[in-house]
């Protein structure tokens, strides 16, 4: 059963990863996000540093996510979604509105992607071990395949740039829990094809805590 679900997840992951290359061009209006200028992006992202840190590591892990090493395409898409109202957050919706050009957003996104990839502090807790199993094997009885299929080994991502499946290994636990709960409740609706919402709805509160605990330590 685990093998069947994992194989299905791998096939779906490859399909959506291929789709993401085309989607990135559409999201950016035909512009190649990866060609942004990280040096210019550092200056343009000054306001971002107050929450996400100069190095892309959150100044308050209970509130703000890490951006260090995150895919530029994913950052670009999320900021656009905040601008368009497809994703809601009081702070980010306001901040996103201050980025007035796609070129500036591209430079900012590439700046954060250029940083050393986010890294957490490993924990040997029973909860983290449960989360590791969910991440790798999924929850077969609930029809949930392993997160590794789309998010890569240890949650560090798959592909050179990916606008759909973010780096989540080393992300803050509070942010991961909130996003999974928001997807589960329907508060967040900008995931591709509703895929993550469907998964989150099948996870128990404890399973959400477990997978977030594991990923926060990667």
Where are these regions (language model features)?
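Axial heme c-ligation environment in periplasmic c-type cytochrome domains
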Residues: 59-66, 81-123, 160-167, 184-218
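Bacterial N-terminal signal peptides
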Residues: 9-18
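The canonical Cys-X-X-Cys-His
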Residues: 41, 48-54, 108, 144-153, ...
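Bacterial N-terminal signal peptides that target proteins for export
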Residues: 1-9
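Detector for the c-type heme attachment site
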Residues: 50-57, 113-114, 150-156, 216-217
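Electrostatic cytochrome c docking/interface patches
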Residues: 24-45, 58-61, 114-141
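Sec/Tat signal peptide C-region and signal peptidase I cleavage site
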Residues: 19-23
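The feature marks the first
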Residues: 28-84
């Amino acid at each position: 059963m685990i093998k069947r679900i994992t194989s299905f997840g791998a096939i779906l992951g490859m399909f959506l990863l291929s789709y993401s290359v085309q989607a990135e061009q559409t999201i950016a209006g035909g512009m190649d996000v990866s060609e942004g200028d990280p040096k210019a992006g550092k200056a343009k992202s000054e306001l971002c540093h107050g929450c996400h840190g100069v190095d892309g590591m959150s100044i308050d892990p209970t509130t703000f996510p890490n951006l260090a090493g995150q895919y530029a395409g994913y950052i670009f898409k999320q900021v656009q979604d905040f601008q368009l109202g497809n994703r809601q957050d009081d702070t980010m919706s306001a901040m996103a509105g201050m980025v007035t050009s796609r070129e500036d957003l591209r430079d900012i996104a590439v700046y954060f992607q250029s940083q050393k990839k986010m890294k957490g502090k490993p924990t040997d807790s029973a909860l983290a071990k449960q989360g590791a199993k969910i991440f790798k094997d999924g929850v077969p009885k609930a029809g949930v395949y392993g997160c590794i299929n789309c998010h890569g080994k240890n949650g560090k991502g798959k592909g050179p740039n990916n606008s759909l499946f973010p780096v989540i290994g080393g992300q803050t636990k509070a942010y991961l829990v909130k996003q999974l709960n928001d997807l589960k409740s329907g508060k967040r609706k900008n995931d591709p094809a509703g895929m993550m919402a469907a998964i989150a709805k099948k996870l128990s509160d404890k399973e959400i805590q477990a997978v977030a605990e594991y990923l926060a330590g990667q």
